Amino acid sequence: MLCAIYKSARKAQTYLFVNKRDDFSSVPEGLMKTFGTPNLVTLINLATKDKLAMADLEKVKKNLIEKGFYLQLPPPQEDLLKEHKAAMAAEKEQGEL
């Protein structure tokens, strides 16, 4: 199963997988507007892969078959301040018990 992977010109760490190079006919128009001009990153054969770096291989294959595309979004950003505040609150609570 060959697919083409494109990087978004507008959204950092956002990638679009499509079945055929330069064929975006199955991608919704609104998504293409938000995605911006696609920049080809690579062509890969998913049949020879055991896993992908940032996406679930089986989910990618399923979406390509059912929808004709797969959108890979960036991982959620860590909120280190929120985590620190939660840890401080937990420490304070333990100290009061």
Swiss-Prot record:
Residues 1-85 form the YcgL domain. It holds the Pfam family YcgL. InterPro entries: YcgL-like_sf, YcgL_dom. It comes from the Bacteria. PANTHER family: PROTEIN YCGL. This is YcgL domain-containing protein CPS_3517. It comes from Colwellia psychrerythraea (strain 34H / ATCC BAA-681).
